[in-house]
Amino acid sequence: MPAVKKPQILVVRNQVIFPYNGFELDVGRERSKKLIKALKNLKTKRLVLVTQKNSDQLNPEFDDIYHCGTLCDIDEIIEVPSEDGKTADYKIKGKGLQRVAITSFSDADLTKYDHHFLNSTLTENKALDKLLERIFPDKEDFAEILDSLNSFLELQELKKLSKVPKDIKRYDIITFKLASLIFKDITLQQAILEENDIEKRLQKIIGSGIEDLGHISEEARAKQRESEFDKIDNRITRKVNEQLSRQQRDFYLREKLRVIREEIGMTSKKEDEVSNIRKKLEENPYPEHIKKRILSELDHFENSSSSSQESTLTKTYIDTLMNLPWWQESKDNADVKNLIKILNKNHSGLDKVKERVVEYLAVQLRTKKLKGPIMCLVGPPGVGKSSLAKSIAEALNKCFVKVSLGGVHDESEIRGHRKTYLGSMPGRILKGMVRAKVINPLFLLDEIDKMTSSNQGYPSGALLEVLDPELNNKFSDNYVEEDYDLSKVMFVATANYIEDIPEALLDRMEVIELTSYTEQEKLQITKSHLVKRCLDDAEIKTDDLKFTDEGISYIIKFYTREAGVRQLERLIQQIVRKYIVNLQKTGEQQVVVDVDLVKKYLKKEIFDYTVRDEDALPGIVNGMAYTPTGGDLLPIEVTHVAGKGDLILTGNLKQTMRESASVALGYVKANAQSFNINPNLFKKVDINIHVPGGGIPKDGPSAGAALVTAIISSLTGKKVDPKIAMTGEITLRGKVMTIGGVKEKTISAYRGGVRTIFMPEKNERYLDEVPKDIVKDLEIILVKEYKDIYNKIFN
């Protein structure tokens, strides 16, 4: 069998460990910490604890320690941060087992020592019982002796010893317990530990002064204690009365308790907290009015009961004032070149947006003033509004704080609750400032268009004070009740729909619109950012899993339908997960993600995009739709049958598009002869206008020109080339009005096979947003009136 190692020796200071006694020790010396660190890995954790004679000795040798210690079981080892913060200290908990005599000791190796165990000796139980009677008169059995110990020393844990048998161990337990509780002097404690004879040990305890208790009756002893307590109480009362005149009873009791603590040299947790707060106020440049307010609240806190609700509320309020940044300021990076570099690194595409952001910030960086309007980024979900704000904060070296305003309907969420209310707290603005810890962060107000109003106030009204540069230097929060300067905060707001932003707020903001990403932009974002991030998260090398451009484009076209790239990223993650599973099964490490693998991993396509018809038919014309996720072709079908001149609209058309259809028909009727249509025909036929995709609601006026063309084509039987598409609102006088979403509509039409596009002349200024490689392959015809379209198509 392998030899069992001796327990190592741990030298302790200012404490003697007795058998049968539990203990806690803080371990901070380097040699001791190495010992405890090694002990953590052992199954049986035992140490021999010996006390050093001089507590100031850092590295005690054999002559510097007492040669009698205690073998102990170590039950718990707790790692705690050290004062230097570099290495960990330890706290150990355990229980003494048996006394040990050390006869030699090696400072180099704590396991090299000679020892033998010490056993207590018992001469006669009766003599010991008599000695115990001197301490505990009139007690018939051991349980009553322990009850007396409890009564005298107020230690309930001794009750569990009442079942210990009447033998040597019984007297060991009593004497060592008494010695640990009564003696504070290390020398006296060590003398008790080294004494083998239980009778002599007990006599030493009696000789310390506790024997006086054995010569007086229970009644006399009670009177003596009462007399001593009276003297102390009278002295305390006298002191309290000097300080009090006419105060309430609870204040009297608290003051009395404070004096008692002074008498016994004990400070409370509250006193420590108050002392720390006063120290911080002295050391830091808090504004004078804030110092005055904190000191006033501190007086209330000191004079309130620690268990009272008032004390908790006051302390929370003080902490809020202390934690708000009043003077702390980070140093901004005013380098515009660095701003451009960071924006280009973190965001593909968005060239117009980045240009506007740089222009907006360049002036503020030059003047070092934030007096201009607040930047508001508006766009569909997932196009990078929040990440753009983060990049701005990174480039300017500003702390980034985000507060989501979606669903906020209570003004108190912005301005805070009055601190007299139960559960009151500051508003989201000042909570964000507490998190920022500086007075000049970049503060993102996310989803500002999602706030609602209720009978609890108007949150948008509270935000006016926050966002107005002329007012926010004295922002008032109901909870703090002190003016707070927000003038150095750079606020950036985000929204999905500009029409949902309250007009008063919109007036204070510089709106920068982020449109949906094109397929080419999504491809670049995926290659530059998404794939790398997904592979890094899964700890996969880029050489092991390669994504082809064709594979990524296939995912974009047939598995996503979104303005941003969130769903696209989720699909990339799904492919990565399937790759890892396949790697575990087959061991195939290097894989190329092409179209075939995308189909295998993601199964059948989820979406499709509209493609033009191959054959031309009367009454069918390609419109162009602008959707929240981009754009698409909008085929319009018109047919006429014998009837009474009714207009039938199908395809889930909303109000605006229904009106546009009525206007289109009215224009055709008014100009029927110009279009070679018999005016009497309208009384004899019903015209049915249908837009395929009945499950999708369709709205907007931009299909007017296409509706007119489809009606003329149906009534005249003339076909329209399917390679043609058009967009533009029509008026009753035939003018083609400007529309929105030029970039998205043009890209989707090109994707669908269209090569000629009619659009309003006033939309020419938006064509520079369309990728040049698409524009060069298209014939874009700009028109003012519908007759320009008619002449090109039908003549």
From Swiss-Prot:
Protein name: Lon protease
GO biological process, one term: protein quality control for misfolded or incompletely synthesized proteins
Catalysis performed (reactions): Hydrolysis of proteins in presence of ATP
Residues of the active site: 702, 745
Assembly mode: Homohexamer. Organized in a ring with a central cavity.
Lineage per the UniProt record: Bacteria, Bacillati, Mycoplasmatota, Mycoplasmoidales, Mycoplasmoidaceae
Pfam family, one: LON_substr_bdg
Primary gene name: lon
A GO molecular function held by the record: ATP-dependent peptidase activity
